[in-house]
Amino acid sequence: MPVRRQARPDAGATSLTWPSGGRHLWPSGGGSGAQAHARGHLVYAARGVLVLHTESGTSIVPANRVAWTPAGSTHRHRAHGETDMRIVFLSPSLARLLPGRPAVFRVSGLAREVLLALTGPRGGGHDDEDGAGAGVDGGDGGGAVPGYGRAASGRLLRVLVEELREADEQPLHLPHPRDDRLRAIEQILTRTPDDTTTLAGLGRQVGASARTLSRLLRDELGMTFYEWRTLVRVHHALVLLAEGHDATYTAHACGWANPSGFIAAFTDLVGTTPGRYRAGG
């Protein structure tokens, strides 16, 4: 049977864990402290929205995405809305097939079913060459559950990784800039996503010209200011929608003058409309 444990009080999660992965049920606002694992892992929110913070940036993981965190990367989680988080650890041989940095992928129907199978009643019972060998979020790593045999578990994990290799990386990982001036602007955008100050105006606050900031954004993040601010706003929008707010409220709270502009930007990044997203589609 899986190890049932109540997570640390600050985390607020009820967890089922085994050597190759686990399942965490978090109330809205729950989360984990900073941690790192010896093996890379995938996290998927079967329900709710998960925010994954790493040293390199922040990833939003809604129900149609999966986030990859390489071995040794310090990270922490936070749930928005009641969140059912699934986690699968990968062996070094499989981890080498994925990026060497945090990434977010769109989840195909097959990948979703494999993730649910590996972390459901039958999954997670074996630690073979293509499985994992570390506990989940500070768990003791014991208590394997009966389920798939070693060979079947290995095949499922290989299918999952191949599905992710075929999937496009999604722009839901928000990298942290290195430059102090960009970091100051990042704090402003994150704290007040409805702020409509231009890049030139923000530059005056941090002591840099719009031209300098544009160059830094291109060099450090590979995006324009418009793309960066839109991504920050969509991150915030996913959280608000998970907390039960409608599209109109969310649009204005995130800085869009009208819902249609918000819907277009949201759909472009997330792959579905805010309404369908709230409805679970």
What are these regions (language model features)?
Residues 1-50, 59:
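Generic protein-terminus/edge-of-domain signal
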Residues 56-71:
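Short acidic-glycine-tyrosine-enriched beta hairpin
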Residues 64, 213, 217, 261-262, ...:
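Short hydrophobic/aromatic patch on the recognition helix
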Residues 72-102:
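Ligand-binding loop in jelly-roll beta-barrel domains
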Residues 99-117:
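Aromatic/histidine-rich interaction motifs
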Residues 124-206, 219-231:
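Short, Lys/Arg-enriched, Trp-marked, Pro/Gly-tolerant hinge/linker segments that flank
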Residues 196-200, 208, 219-263, 279-281:
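Terminal helix-turn-helix DNA-binding modules in bacterial transcription factors
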